């Protein structure tokens, strides 16, 4: 955003007092803040602790404001819970204050409350982890940290959806003024959900073939959830017998796509 020279501010406002450097610091921030995540790729069906870090932007957050991390509704990701810290799929939220500029007042927020709502936002991002702020504001540069599958209390984490997905998105929203009007925090968090290690092989081919014609068969490796494993050019040895006698034998390599 364009910065106004100090002389122009003085001319427009007259004499005023503000912490030195606060204007420049906040003008350098994205207005609605930014989000980051500790993972970029996870295995389908695995247990994880996923940390979402929201750094408040120049807008700050007023008393009673909200923050949401949302997901598409159609997923078999295990449902989050907020009541049993030592159990699976526990989700938590905490506040981290950023350093103050000399003369700047610290944030006054007293506590955060986190909840999970399967239809806590608009389609298609309906599943929502919602953080409410209470009894005070948060200043620009502060952090709200959400842990999906918080393991600090002995829980196993959160069970990821069991099917692979390229560019799984977590879209975050903030209501900075506490008016229940949300704006997206760009860009989205993007995670690659990839297959696990091969657990079984699957054949695919026609049930009917003419006499004397070759029968094409395709073989693929699947993980424990039935996802096709890619980027694993494993060596496979194929043999076939008829009446106890070998009729076919071949060594091949699975493609990496």
Describe the function of each predicted region.
Residues 207-210, 253-257:
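Alpha-helix capping and helix-loop boundary segments enriched in small/acidic/polar residues
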Residues 32, 122-131, 241-256:
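Short beta-strand and strand-turn-strand segments in soluble, beta-rich domains
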Residues 61-65, 163-169, 221-252:
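Short flexible loop/turn segments that cap and initiate beta-strands
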Residues 1-206, 210, 216, 224-226:
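Ser/Thr/Pro/Gly-rich, low-complexity intrinsically disordered stalk/linker tracts of secreted
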